[in-house]
């Protein structure tokens, strides 16, 4: 059973990593450009939704991999690391999916509203897009900390203890 979990987790990790790489290569960038230019670029982006869809599938596969690797830790003294690592993996993956969904729908939609706003509405449309942008960034920072930081750290501690 343990061998099957490890193999499935390894395949999920490999495919998820390849999809994450592809999704990030396709994803439009904001860079250090002024916010209004970024919103205009995202309003016209044809690759944002495709990239986010690819990244959602990647995160699902990587979450499966993290949970499987965590569950492969055996021994009573390692159970806490396995459970915490799996929990942080699921929590981080869930936040990531929410962030990609928000970005793909609300961020792009509000950028389009800003782009098409008439003169009297430009300021409020900008600040609405800016608010969605800040929520999107907050979710991104949170899931990267939990999914790419805490989950592998806890699982790594368990693996180091098992060696």
Tell where the protein language model's regions lie, with residue ranges:
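Hydrophobic, aromatic-enriched alpha-helical segments typical of multi-pass transmembrane helices
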Residues: 1-163
